[in-house]
Amino acid sequence: MSESLLQTVVAYVELVLHHFMALSWTQQLSIVIVAPFIYSLVWQTLYSFRKDRVPLVPFMVPWVGSALAYGRAPYEFFGKCQQKYGDVFAFMLLGRVMTVYLGTKGHEFILNAKLAEVSAEEAYTKLTTPVFGEGVVYDCPNHRLMEQKKFCKNALSTEAFRRYVPMVMDEVRKYLRTSKHFMMNERSSGVVNVMETQPEMTIFTASRSLLGAEMHSMLDADFAYLYADLDKGFTPLNFVFRDLPLDNYRRRDNAQRTISSTYMKVIERRRKNNDVQDRDLIDALMTSAQYKDGVKMTDQQIANLLIGVLMGGQHTSAATSAWVLLHLAERPDIQEELYEEQMRVLDGGAKELTYELLQEMPLLNQVIKETLRMHHPLHSLFRKVTRDMPVPNTSYVIPKDHYVLASPGFCHLSEEYFPNAKEFNPHRWDNDAASSVSTGEKVDYGFGAISKGVSSPYLPFGGGRHRCIGEGFAYMQLGTIFSVVVRSMKWHFPADMKGVPNPDFTSMVTLPSEPCRIAWERRVPDQII
């Protein structure tokens, strides 16, 4: 900018300020309040004139945009927008332009986008780094994340699952015996809140199997609540603001420090005593967490990655297991079918459950699969656009620094793909009991070969390079939990519950809203759990 032009601009600014300061305070306040609305209206008008932009959902409040409608009921919001604009549209979310592409073509466009076009790291780092900690997951380059996934691969192998099943089974039995919510060896019935029991049950089973006996011995029910505080750090507000002086932010930070410190104590003790063996994921990371370029993960980064691994294996499993209990409370007929399947496969209880026997229980897997269809753990998957992205077969171009959003969960509830989509029906999978789509061309992003295709209408674990690597663990964990639970008790809704509660979308993880209780009774009154 030339000196003369700069002087002209400064002169105009001074003139405007002079006239502004000459106004009364009420006039000044009116301008300050009205100006953003005028700017927003002009911006939306100019946006609508551009033929290379996807349709934008109009909004009244500047910056906030459609945040309230989206945050309260995202699937309902998507459905209304789809009816008006089609599968591709944009909306304003707290100062960010979000381009939504619904349906299977949207899955392919966003989840299989080139690394040069979109970034999950830039989209999620404000949300995830305060929860997991620095240097891991989305607080590092993508190639580092791919290697971190590979470090965890052995803990998520079929051989590992064979070891985990007895551990998970033992933990569930122990929980049913000793938890204040059940105390089954002393009580024959009771009423429990599933969002109190299931986070505890899943944290105990995940920690016992993934982190080993030493770490597990340091955990109690309060540890599950710390992870719940981390869960509450996953909200649309956290997506925009990394730090705010609010209670849920403070609780998130306290939980992160406490959990990280607990892991560090174990790591430091093992280092000090030269006690690194091959017992659990902690040992595995302490011995093998070295990147291809020779850089080793620090112990603090290992602790942070452990938070991420257990978080991935806990918060979604807790939500899913809660939904399973709630849906089965409404379907005692399916409870009985599950019990009959257990008795048939386990020879009336004469056989102990194994990983191989879990694979012989199709209905159990179908219940989990149907629950994941109806309640995708994450209702929205984001990427930040790092290079202008043309939308195939349209004139639209999504500009750099906008965001793209895919919603497999919306597809899961579409009548186009799943007839009677709002009905819980595990038998819709009778001819397709496998956990997820696994056929077709494979691709290796650095952590093992996975299915390349993401155009399926059923993607409970996402797709592409950021696909969740814990699908096998989730089915093993949830299958083992409900094998024990179904053999131990029957359950239904208490009198004040009118059916399966609606989802609560205030968190990024789809949880059941309160009240979410079940009334249970022991299946065999004198049986020792």
Swiss-Prot record:
InterPro entries, per database record: CYP450_sterol_14alpha_dmase, Cyt_P450, Cyt_P450_CS, Cyt_P450_E_grp-IV, Cyt_P450_sf
GO terms for MF: heme binding; iron ion binding; oxidoreductase activity; sterol 14-demethylase activity
Catalyzed reactions: a 14alpha-methyl steroid + 3 reduced [NADPH--hemoprotein reductase] + 3 O2 = a Delta(14) steroid + formate + 3 oxidized [NADPH--hemoprotein reductase] + 4 H2O + 4 H(+); a 14alpha-methyl steroid + reduced [NADPH--hemoprotein reductase] + O2 = a 14alpha-hydroxymethyl steroid + oxidized [NADPH--hemoprotein reductase] + H2O + H(+); a 14alpha-hydroxymethyl steroid + reduced [NADPH--hemoprotein reductase] + O2 = a 14alpha-formyl steroid + oxidized [NADPH--hemoprotein reductase] + 2 H2O + H(+); a 14alpha-formyl steroid + reduced [NADPH--hemoprotein reductase] + O2 = a Delta(14) steroid + formate + oxidized [NADPH--hemoprotein reductase] + H2O + 2 H(+)
Biological processes annotated in GO: ergosterol biosynthetic process
PROSITE patterns linked: CYTOCHROME_P450 (PS00086)
GO CC, alphabetical: cortical endoplasmic reticulum; membrane; perinuclear endoplasmic reticulum
Domain of life, per lineage: Eukaryota
Cofactor(s) recorded in Swiss-Prot or TrEMBL: heme
Enzyme Commission number, as recorded: 1.14.14.154
Pfam families the UniProt entry points to: p450
Membrane-crossing residue ranges in chain numbering: none
Keyword match Metal-binding: yes
CDD domains documented for this protein: CYP51-like
Group of enzyme by EC: oxidoreductase
Keywords, sorted A to Z: Heme, Iron, Lipid biosynthesis, Lipid metabolism, Membrane, Metal-binding, Monooxygenase, Oxidoreductase, Steroid biosynthesis, Steroid metabolism, Sterol biosynthesis, Sterol metabolism
Subcellular location: Membrane
Keyword Coiled coil included in the entry's annotation: no
Pathway: Steroid biosynthesis; zymosterol biosynthesis; zymosterol from lanosterol: step 1/6
Primary residence: membrane
Gene3D superfamilies linked to this entry: Cytochrome P450
Binding site for heme: 468
Protein function: Sterol 14alpha-demethylase that plays a critical role in the third module of ergosterol biosynthesis pathway, being ergosterol the major sterol component in fungal membranes that participates in a variety of functions. The third module or late pathway involves the ergosterol synthesis itself through consecutive reactions that mainly occur in the endoplasmic reticulum (ER) membrane. In filamentous fungi, during the initial step of this module, lanosterol (lanosta-8,24-dien-3beta-ol) can be metabolized to eburicol.
Family in the record: Belongs to the cytochrome P450 family.
Protein name, UniProt field: Lanosterol 14-alpha demethylase
